[in-house]
Amino acid sequence: MMHRLYHYPLSPFSRKVRLVLAEKKIEVELIEERYWEPSPEFLRLNPAGRVPILRINNYTFCESNSICEYLEEKYPDYPLMPNNVEERAEVRRIVNWFDDSFYKEVTLNLLGERIMKKIKGTGYPDSKNVKEGAKRIKFHLDYIADLLDNRRWLAGNTMSMADFSAAAQVSCIDYISDVDWNRSSAVKDWYAKIKCRPAFRSLLADQISGFPQPQHYSDLDF
């Protein structure tokens, strides 16, 4: 069975799917797609023009959460959703928090302004947006710390899709050195646990032309 993932290395939604595929030990061919310059083939696969897109034989799956839910149901080994229905609801809530709130308030304002505008050729960083992102990430790091106050992982005592959704966003911001790892030892320890997982290796190897990763980015010991 051929798995093919159309992705962009600094797309947090692509990263989330890559983490799930790797954690479930599913081999996949990665195809880097400059989604802002979509090819006709790419638009045929997803008229919305967004990554990630997962192709499995003749089936096409779009949107990261739909893909992740499919993979969880299709490949139940190495589960990333708890059995308890209330716990599953909490996982989904946290996934949505990072996919929506963190992405809009932090990722777009920091990664979007500082790197993606240059890559896309759409102008210069807006300092107002960058300042807002730098302000909001403090709130989100504190929220992660609050979640970890009485939990081993973000949604409970086992690692779940919630952790991968959060780590996908945080890793993109870490690529541009905009995460204050001294703000919370609990957050740093949580990220270190995820960072050390074999599933994370391909993300740590990502290189963006013109934007070298910081030295600590791939350092498992920070």
Task: For every predicted segment, state its role.
Residues Y35-W36, M159, S209-G210:
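Positions that flank functional sites
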Residues Q207-F222:
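Acidic/histidine-enriched, glycine/proline-rich intrinsically disordered or flexible terminal extensions
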Residues R197-P198, S202-L203:
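A late-sequence structural motif
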Residues M1-K131, A145, D221:
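GST-like domain detector, emphasizing the conserved glutathione-binding G-site
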Residues Y8, M161, Q207-I208:
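Short, solvent-exposed turn/loop segments enriched in Gly/Ser/Thr/Pro and often Arg
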Residues F98-C196:
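GST-like fold's C-terminal all-alpha helical module
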Residues E90-R93, D189, S202:
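Short, solvent-exposed alpha-helical surface patches in well-structured domains
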